[in-house]
Design a protein with these regions (language model features):
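Conserved beta-strand cores of small sensory beta-sandwich domains that regulate signal transduction
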Residues: 89, 195-197
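Short regulatory alpha-helical segment in sensory/regulatory domains of signaling proteins that mediates
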Residues: 17, 35, 72-83, 186-191
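Well-ordered, non-membrane alpha-helical segments in soluble/globular domains
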Residues: 64-74
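Conserved beta-strands of PAS-like sensory domains
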Residues: 153-187
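Juxtamembrane extracytoplasmic/periplasmic/luminal helical "stalk" adjacent to the first N-terminal
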Residues: 1-65
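Amphipathic alpha-helical bundle/coiled-coil segments
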Residues: 17, 125-130, 159, 175
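Extracellular/periplasmic ligand-sensing ectodomains of membrane signal-transduction proteins
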Residues: 62, 78-141, 146-152
Length: 198
């Protein structure tokens, strides 16, 4: 009996862990890319070259446009991967991304990923007071919110701080639909009253 429970628990744990791994790997890739961009800017300064933002009606410094594209491609891939990830974004501290935009946010929902589009998540005064932002910023660590309901769906938000020279430059957020975990295996004919809860 114990082996059956262990096997079921391991199988379900792997399902949940795979979602967390996709989120963490994507956040780590974005963190590293942004950190490299900061290093390049510190070493080379501003080149004077600009490109139009995919989201805002502004010209971004070329390196920041490359960061924006990297964020988008990774978010589109992660959100449309068929996992429980329903949204992903990057929210910066004021003036921490590009001088052309004080409050720079970029977010990809499931519908955005399907259309290869994105959206703003509002101004700094709106997102900087949210627990997913403040806790990651203040602790300089990965945080997970308590479950909450958004448009009738139970969610958690995982947040990773963007650090450069030990200064928080922003936060990467990943929204996870915990209702997707209801597909966890809890069927065993030997144990008809068995259920799984995450």
């Amino acid at each position: 009996i114990n082996d059956e429970f262990i096997g079921l628990a391991e199988k379900n744990g792997q399902k949940v862990q795979s979602v967390v791994d996709v989120a963490a790997n994507t956040a780590s890739n974005i963190q590293a890319y942004i950190e490299d961009a900061y290093k390049i800017q510190d070493q080379n300064g501003y080149t004077g070259e600009t490109e139009k933002s995919a989201l805002y009606d502004i010209q971004l410094q070329r390196i920041n446009k490359q960061v924006e594209d990297f964020i988008l491609y990774n978010a589109w891939s992660s959100v449309s991967s068929g996992s429980a990830i329903t949204g992903m974004g990057v929210f910066f501290e004021p003036n921490a991304f590009d001088p052309a935009k004080t409050d720079y946010t970029i977010y990809v929902s499931e519908s955005d990923a399907a259309k290869k589009s994105c959206q703003s998540y509002g101004s700094y005064s709106e997102y900087s007071t949210q627990s997913y932002y403040t806790e990651a910023k203040n602790t300089k660590n990965t945080v997970f919110t308590d479950p909450y309901e958004d448009q009738g769906v139970t969610m958690v938000t995982a947040s990773w701080p963007i650090l450069y020279n030990n200064t928080v430059k922003g936060v990467i957020v990943v929204d996870i639909n915990v209702e997707q975990f209801s597909i966890l295996d809890s069927n065993d004919e030997s144990f008809k009253s068995l259920y799984v809860d995450v």
